[in-house]
Amino acid sequence: MAKGQSLQDPFLNALRRERVPVSIYLVNGIKLQGQIESFDQFVILLKNTVSQMVYKHAISTVVPSRPVSHHSNNAGGGSSNYHHGGSAQGSSAPQQDSDDAE
């Protein structure tokens, strides 16, 4: 199972570490926006004005607002499968879109 997450974990960890704003599209078409606070094998904690626990099985696509380097050999990347966010810095929170899926 670790082999299946060899791309997912470094990608999500880079987004978390660099506090990159992301849009997460769910399989039902809903778009969530925020920053990845932490994640594990099954869920992602997405922080905007509140923290939301989003189950990975409900996610279709994760779209970063800017390109990120997510190579697994980055310094400080580590090999842990569980990543927890630190304290949030004083950055402006991304706004949540209320796009209606039609």
Swiss-Prot record:
Cellular component aspect of the GO annotation: cytosol
Boundaries of every Sm domain copy: 9-68
GO biological process per UniProt: regulation of DNA-templated transcription; regulation of RNA stability; regulation of translation, ncRNA-mediated
Residue spans of biased composition, Low complexity class: 70-86
Recorded GO MF terms: RNA binding
SUPFAM superfamilies xrefs: Sm-like ribonucleoproteins (SSF50182)
Region annotated Disordered, chain positions: 63-102
One Pfam family named in its UniProt record: Hfq
Keyword vocabulary terms for this entry: RNA-binding, Stress response
Function: RNA chaperone that binds small regulatory RNA (sRNAs) and mRNAs to facilitate mRNA translational regulation in response to envelope stress, environmental stress and changes in metabolite concentrations. Also binds with high specificity to tRNAs.
Family of the protein in this entry: Belongs to the Hfq family.
Subunit field text: Homohexamer.
Protein name as it appears in the record: RNA-binding protein Hfq
Organism lineage: Bacteria, Pseudomonadati, Pseudomonadota, Gammaproteobacteria, Enterobacterales
UniProt gene name: hfq
